[in-house]
Amino acid sequence: MMADKTSPMITSDHSISNFSTGLFGPHPTVPPDVGVVTSSQSQMKDLFGLFCMVTLNLIALLANTGVMVAIARAPHLKKFAFVCHLCAVDVLCAILLMPLGIISSSPFFGTVVFTILECQVYIFLNVFLIWLSILTITAISVERYFYIVHPMRYEVKMTINLVIGVMLLIWFKSLLLALVTLFGWPPYGHQSSIAASHCSLHASHSRLRGVFAVLFCVICFLAPVVVIFSVYSAVYKVARSAALQQVPAVPTWADASPAKDRSDSINSQTTIITTRTLPQRLSPERAFSGGKAALTLAFIVGQFLVCWLPFFIFHLQMSLTGSMKSPGDLEEAVNWLAYSSFAVNPSFYGLLNRQIRDELVKFRRCCVTQPVEIGPSSLEGSFQENFLQFIQRTSSSSETHPSFANSNPRNMENQAHKIPGQIPEEQA
């Protein structure tokens, strides 16, 4: 188990100065002053870093648990099975992976050593849970693609058996790749223990470290990025096309032309009604113009890239170059930037959804003595919210009225204000 550096360390043929571990390439020897704070400034920096890591860990645990509870206790939210699965994976990351990352990254734990088994478990959890989370995000994007671009096919084929099958496939593929870190090659030489700060993804004695590095980056990052970008681009095109097909705001009687032929009225399939009786709909110019839809998708895809791109580039570069010196601060930064994905995922895939938020408010109202009122959904909400409701398969009832082109003029006649001199329409 983990031990303090002051206690005797178990080694076979090498001293602690020869420790070199990981998956991809050689690592510098353990410096004699590991974990020693040299100044008050560095101590404050280390303390701030520890605070940020612990905060991210707590946010990941609480936020993902909250979204899971909201989905589990509401039958109408069962359609978010993949979102619930993502939150469950991120909870595992918050419980198993992130605490080990704190021990490995923080100088306050610089005197801690791992046994070889413990270090292997840490490396295994890194590959397994990271791949599991990324695969689930990819599955969510593909599900949204089929729901919006191919809705009929989605309704027929998206069954509970298919959802369970996809989840089992995700777990199997993640486990298969992670097992390579345990049985693929002996990455630790003849060592029997290792400093926790040197238990890293990018170090290995094996000549296959470069092959695994490329495989890890292509399968776990490059392929998911291509899939996510492609499907959300298709979703954007469909959303843009649907918005442009919506009829803009109907002019009032005062704005209408006073002279109209009877033939125009007969051929028209739309009854002239005032905007006061017309349901308030967001026009395409207000909802999708100016690149706002692209900006929303940029937030979703950009969050994934910001969290994971530096992580994979760093470890790929370190493994291919075989660098003997690892910049510790940079490695900690890219690792925890990647781990921050576990804390922000529930916001991007759960809390931005109005139905899940409302369910969380209801749950809070049940837990506290003072009731919390849920305000009505606003039709004039932010574009990001409206677009996310579209791609996340939710919308308020007031946002789902049929368009004019599909409405029967006879059915709307009783709801329209009678306009003086209006010529009644005849059915085609």
UniProtKB/Swiss-Prot annotation:
Residues 398-428 are annotated as: Disordered. InterPro entries: GPCR_Rhodpsn, GPCR_Rhodpsn_7TM. GO terms for biological process: G protein-coupled receptor signaling pathway. It is a multi-pass membrane protein. Residues 68-93, 142-162, 232-293 are cytoplasmic. It comes from the Eukaryota. Glycans are attached at N18. The chain crosses the membrane at residues 47-67, 94-114, 121-141, 163-183, 211-231, 294-314. Keywords: Cell membrane, G-protein coupled receptor, Glycoprotein, Membrane, Receptor, Transducer, Transmembrane, Transmembrane helix. GO terms for cellular component: endosome; plasma membrane; receptor complex. Residues 398-414 have a biased composition (Polar residues). SUPFAM superfamilies: Family A G protein-coupled receptor-like. It is found in: Cell membrane. One of its GO terms (molecular function) is G protein-coupled receptor activity. Residues 1-46, 115-120, 184-210, 315-428 are extracellular. Belongs to the G-protein coupled receptor 1 family. This is Probable G-protein coupled receptor. It comes from Oryzias latipes (Japanese rice fish). The lineage of its organism: Eukaryota, Metazoa, Chordata, Craniata, Vertebrata.
